[in-house]
Amino acid sequence: MNPARKKPSLLFSSLLFSSLLFSSLLFSSLLFPSAAQAAGEGNGRGPYVQADLAYAYEHITHDYPEPTGTKKDKISTVSDYFRNIRTHSIHPRVSVGYDFGGWRIAADYARYRKWNNNKYSVNIKELLRNDNANSGGNKHLNIKTRKTEHRENGTFHAASSLGLSAVYDFDTGSRFKPYIGMRVAYGHVRHQVRSVQQETIAVTTYPQNAASSVTTNAPIRKLPHHESRSISSLGFGAVAGVGIDITPKLTLDAGYRYHNWGRLENTRFKTHEASLGVRYRF
């Protein structure tokens, strides 16, 4: 699967998500004006829970050491196989926090979609070429080649992210409350690669006055290679968005968050997320 082929579907999903988000915000602002005003007059303090549906854009970049560097023999499977992954997922997220009436702190948990990729490559190399002639003077050409087939199957899964955020809500005197904040999270990533390779030797004969013929040996299969890694790392990010008070206890939340998961072997994993959710204060 070539990640570049996903661009049309990624664009369509992004536009669809944006349309739904705008419609929800417009609907809420028109439907609940009086209740939102009452919410703005409250002190806004207390514990809360929040549920979001997030659209995540996941991006892996490789960071190769120089050939003469000290890490030249530590090229990771992630770098070799998952270089420049760009994919997306839609996933739920839950948060539990406390609102201090301006500042909020929250712990959140999310689990992402597994990404799969398959690769197939073939290489044909000429090993020998002979011009021969039989006793009758008829010439024929023999060409010996080696065909190498390589198949790879891999998965990459941001299995979980457990984060802690500190957020500040700006009081605009209306139902709309923009916010910004910082986030630190402990992320868990799993990835694996399985590859198989086989070689086939073939001799093609081209007679002078006849059709060519091919003679092949049985394929020689090399032992399959399988590697699986599980990595945990501490990363940092930022959050921003706007809350719309629906009732004194219920708030519609439209947000964005950026998170750098940190260094995974010698790659860097980052996510950009747009989310829509509801926050209920007790």
From Swiss-Prot:
Cellular location of this protein? Answer: Cell outer membrane
Ranges in coiled-coil conformation: none
Is Plastid given among the entry's keywords? Answer: no
Alphabetic keyword roster: Cell outer membrane, Membrane, Signal, Transmembrane, Transmembrane beta strand
Question: Which GO terms of the molecular function aspect are on file?
Answer: porin activity
Q: What is its main location?
A: membrane
GO CC field: cell outer membrane
- Gene3D superfamilies from the UniProt entry: 2.40.160.20
Renumbered to this chain, the signal peptide range is 1-38
Tell me which family the UniProt entry assigns to this protein.
Belongs to the opacity porin family.
Q: What does this protein do?
A: Implicated in a number of adherence functions. OPA proteins are implicated in pathogenesis and are subject to phase variation.
The entry's other comment says: Expression of opacity proteins is regulated by the number of translated repeat elements CTCTT, which code for part of the signal sequence; the protein can only be synthesized when the number of repeats place the start codon in frame with the rest of the protein.
The protein, known as: Opacity protein opA54
Q: Which organism is it from?
A: Neisseria gonorrhoeae
